[in-house]
Regions:
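Dinucleotide-binding Rossmann-like beta1-alpha1 core, especially the glycine-rich loop
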Residues: 47-130
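Helical element adjacent to the flavin cofactor pocket in flavoenzyme catalytic cores
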Residues: 144-180, 189
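Glycine-rich FAD pyrophosphate-binding loop
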Residues: 22-44
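Short hydrophobic core segments
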Residues: 6-8, 31, 183-192, 325
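N-terminal Rossmann-like FAD-binding beta1-loop-alpha1 element of flavoenzymes
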Residues: 3-29
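C-terminal catalytic lobe of FAD-dependent flavoproteins
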Residues: 276-351
């Protein structure tokens, strides 16, 4: 075992993996030009929803166990992180409301709820009147609603800063360099930086941050508006996050069409969004794989070095971070790969 374990990548997966290594008494060095900061990766611009139920999509049966296991791992991670630093993370267990804009959206919500049940999970269908009792800012003419008490959230930027503070307190060294050699490092969590080695594609997502004159909502509100998804996420200090589009073009800046549609749909669900100030519009770039599953597993480099890959978490990097970080540390230190990660082997893309 190396005296110092090298983690390549300082996004949410790299930072949680490094933290879990320090939890096990390991010395760690992290390589990233902008660890936990505004860069070209996905973590800084993520919504931060820990929502295995609301986030699952049709035909994602292999992904769902990962999402559930990681959501279940968050309370332990947050307790252990709080034992090292008192920095805020924005971890919030208030729950999630899913609402439908019209009857077609309500029918889609029922179909999705049936899929949840097929996975032995459920969203509680509630009257719109109850949804508005929970969140008075909701539009009065919504067509349907469901409550998912187990879908939570974290504020990614706060979370990463807390991880950085904890890692520095434990003596982790940060090297602000970009690594381009795929054979460098013990654990590789570089997102799209590994696109030359694995079939990763950039999926862009426009995301907005608003400042509300007063708190708008307490729950995460996910809406379906003409079958388009939109979410309204409350943040500490009256900030609101609205997202997110999903596009596979080459625009690295927010498009007017995407910003317009996000605001229009958010206002349809929570009309008071119209009273907010727009303080940021940006684009996150998610590393997607052909099957939408992460890439997780061992490989041997060209120089014969043992290496662990933890990459390609696509839209679920924040949600999957608790499990990916824990599993990454454990597997690198010699434990078996958790069964949830069995479909995620890098070998499935080997030619």
């Amino acid at each position: 075992m190396a005296e110092v374990i090298t983690v390549v990548g300082g996004g949410i997966i790299g930072l949680t993996t490094a933290f879990e290594l320090t939890e096990r008494g390991q010395r760690v060095r992290v390589y990233d030009p902008t660890p936990g900061e505004r860069g070209t990766g996905a973590s800084y611009f993520a919504g931060g929803m820990l929502a295995p139920i609301a986030e699952v999509q049709f035909q994602q049966d292999a992904l769902f166990p990962l999402m559930v296991s990681s959501a279940n791992a968050y309370p332990s991670l947050m307790r252990r992180l709080a034992a090292v630093t008192d920095a805020p993370t924005g971890y919030d267990t208030t729950g999630t409301l899913v609402v439908a804009g019209d009857r077609a959206d309500a029918a889609h919500l029922r179909d999705v709820s049936d899929y949840y049940r097929s996975l032995n999970r459920s969203a509680e269908a509630i009257p719109v009147s109850r949804a508005r009792a929970l969140e008075p800012a909701l539009a009065p003419d919504l067509a349907g609603a469901a409550l998912i008490e187990g879908d939570h959230q974290v504020a990614p930027r706060l979370f990463m800063q807390a991880l950085l503070k904890a890692l520095r307190a434990r003596g982790v060294e940060f090297v602000r360099e970009r690594v381009t050699d795929p054979d460098f490092g013990d654990i590789v969590c570089t997102g799209l930086g590994a696109a030359g080695q694995y079939p990763l594609r950039p999926v862009y997502g426009d995301i907005l941050r608003l400042q509300a004159p007063h708190p708008l909502v307490e729950h995460v509100v996910r809406g379906l508006v003409n079958e388009r998804p939109v979410y309204v996420i409350p943040r500490p200090g009256g900030e609101v996050c609205i997202g997110a589009t999903s596009r596979e073009d080459t625009r690295t800046r927010p498009g007017v069409d995407g910003v317009y549609q996000l605001l229009k749909d958010a206002i349809r669900v929570v009309p008071a969004v119209e009273e907010c100030e727009l303080i940021e519009s940006n684009v996150g770039v998610r590393p997607g794989t052909p099957d939408d599953l992460p890439i997780f597993g061992k490989r041997i480099t060209a120089t014969g070095q043992r290496q662990l890959i933890s990459n390609g978490h696509f839209r679920h990097g924040i949600l999957l971070a608790a499990l990916a970080g824990k599993a990454g540390a454990e597997v690198f230190l010699g434990e078996d790969i958790p069964p949830e990660f069995a479909p995620c082997s890098p070998k499935r893309f080997e030619r």
